[in-house]
Amino acid sequence: MTLLVPLYVHPAEDPGAWHRLITAAARTYAIVLNPANGPGTDPDRAFTAVAEALRAAGARLLGYVDTDYGHRDRAEIAEDLRRHQRWYAADGCFLDRVTATPGGLPACRRLVRSVRRLGARTVVLNPGVHPAPGYARLADLTVTFEGHWSTYVSAFSRPRWTARQPSERFCHLVYGVPEALVPLAVRTAHERGAAVCGPVTGEPPNPWAELTPALTEMER
């Protein structure tokens, strides 16, 4: 079990969280960098510094890119990736808000091919739900659940086709987890066929502003 860590807080606002993440970087699957709902229009020196420290610690860095469920122009997505690569030396990309329907699959396939050609070594898709089966073959990792802990424990269902895929291809991102139940959230993700997870205690509108306590649990 490894952790995908989207930490959406500026290093100047919570330097302690970034320091802890750098210390634990080797125990993560990847870290999602999101300076400004994407790379922003200019390099951010604070993010440049933490990105350099994370790389030195052995982390895999993914640049956050919003796809707007297939409505965003592919050239804009490509430019976001290039900025992440130039400014923060991102290894790949975290494609957020991707489509999940069979009808959106061809366009998503073209998008993944285009970011691969641009040098994205790791591609993570985040539809936030179980997509049509073909999506899982496009990316290195697919987020098949993003939502609140209460929903995760009461309304999660797993399509049969996922059992035919390696668990290393799936990730569950769960927020609103009571801190005492974070180890349970990690175990539950594993039992539900996701070898990668990211349980956090934070709540909307930005639950990812806090570092996952699971990193501390892994030290024990």
PLM feature segments, named:
Residues M1-R220:
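Glycan-processing catalytic domains of CAZymes
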